[in-house]
Amino acid sequence: MAVITILEFPSVTRELYEQVGAALSGAPDGILYHACGPIPDGWRILGIWESQEAFDAFTDGVYIPAMQAQGGALPARRDVTPAHHAGPVLRG
């Protein structure tokens, strides 16, 4: 089942986010949609994933270690919500 995810990292800037992204090797398995942007005192990452298992495997095994290697903190917020709908919006 698809899931909607939110990660919020305190004190992360656009520059740090881009450094972490540059250290990764392409899109992770299982991601369907990604969006991110600044929030007060940090950075928010939203995603839609094929499953919570895919999200957890990437986040815990790849992304958080990469963030910490660049001097970033652990996420202050980590939410996973089952998606009722995950797909394009049809305009009609």
Residue ranges of each PLM-predicted region?
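Short S/T/G/P-rich N-terminal loop/turn motif that feeds into the first structured element of a domain
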Residues: 1-46, 50-65, 72-92
